[in-house]
Amino acid sequence: WIMGHMVNAIAQIDEFVNLGANSIETDVSFDKNANPEYTYHGIPCDCGRTCTKWEYFNTFLGGLRKATTPGDSKYHEKLVLVVFDLKTGSLYDNQAYDAGTKLAKSLLQNYWNKGNKGGRAYIVLSIPNLDHYKLITGFKETLTKEEHPELMDKVGYDFSGNDDIGDVAKAYKKAGVTGHVWQSDGITNCLLRGLDRVRKAVANRDSSNGYINKVYYWTVDKRASTRDALDAGVDGIMTNYPDVIADVLSESAYTAKFRIATYDDNPWETFKN
């Protein structure tokens, strides 16, 4: 999965997919009542990027729905996965459940079209704080209450705080999550980060009793660091330059082992090294 980083304006969906992304990451900020409000990152952000592009969250979902609904004039067949980077740092811990509830209602209405031929992309809810695991509970219980529990088949999870792998496992246990787990590792492109924790995550994925289904690394903009991440066995790379990742994937060293995921590739299925 080539994951376009910080895609927060509708116009950027086309831009990143046209550069080779089959997945995008979108920042979601919340108001003080835990309503998802804007797709917005803010300053500071990655080096070389404009930090302030934004839409209202529900407006963005409308654009995203069009981009992932077959038959729509804006449809991109290859856009198959969306990571919502949920900026829950502005919330109190006890608001996490409400944030999950409100997020589910927004997606149900504006993305899934109440379950009637909505957008088809798989969704990863990426949460920065292990203490906010109840966001997952709120999300799940709301879709059940709204009589669309089947949509959870399209939803996966990530805790993005670079926490100890064992602590992440405990948070999933509390949330009752037993699959659909993406594990991120990384740092802003302005700084360097080694691959030690990525290798631990890959080892967990490849073990017989691990909780991780997929591992992705962020934010990778250079050919050398792309090769290092692929050599470590990641499933996804988040980038500001999808064309760079696509170029490296077409090198003879990688074409035998990797290909770009399509809609038929189940993002919750573990593919071991």
From Swiss-Prot:
Top-level lineage group: Eukaryota
Subcellular location field: Secreted
Residues at the active site: 5, 41
Gene Ontology MF: a single term: lyase activity
Binding site for Mg(2+): 25, 27, 85
Cofactor note: Binds 1 Mg(2+) ion per subunit.
SUPFAM superfamilies: PLC-like phosphodiesterases
InterPro entries on file: PLC-like_Pdiesterase_TIM-brl (IPR017946)
Catalytic activity: an N-(acyl)-sphingosylphosphocholine = an N-(acyl)-sphingosyl-1,3-cyclic phosphate + choline; an N-(acyl)-sphingosylphosphoethanolamine = an N-(acyl)-sphingosyl-1,3-cyclic phosphate + ethanolamine; a 1-acyl-sn-glycero-3-phosphocholine = a 1-acyl-sn-glycero-2,3-cyclic phosphate + choline; a 1-acyl-sn-glycero-3-phosphoethanolamine = a 1-acyl-sn-glycero-2,3-cyclic phosphate + ethanolamine
Sorted UniProt keywords: Cytolysis, Dermonecrotic toxin, Disulfide bond, Hemolysis, Lipid degradation, Lipid metabolism, Lyase, Magnesium, Metal-binding, Secreted, Toxin
Names of required cofactors: Mg(2+)
CDD domains linked: GDPD_like_SMaseD_PLD
GO CC terms of this entry: extracellular region
Tissue: Expressed by the venom gland.
Disulfides per UniProt: 45-51, 47-190
Keyword Lipid metabolism: yes
E.C. designation(s): 4.6.1.-
Biological process according to GO: killing of cells of another organism; lipid catabolic process
Free-text function comment from the UniProt entry: Dermonecrotic toxins cleave the phosphodiester linkage between the phosphate and headgroup of certain phospholipids (sphingolipid and lysolipid substrates), forming an alcohol (often choline) and a cyclic phosphate. This toxin acts on sphingomyelin (SM). It may also act on ceramide phosphoethanolamine (CPE), lysophosphatidylcholine (LPC) and lysophosphatidylethanolamine (LPE), but not on lysophosphatidylserine (LPS), and lysophosphatidylglycerol (LPG). It acts by transphosphatidylation, releasing exclusively cyclic phosphate products as second products.
Recorded family membership: Belongs to the arthropod phospholipase D family. Class II subfamily.
Name of the protein in question: Dermonecrotic toxin LsaSicTox-alphaIB1aiv
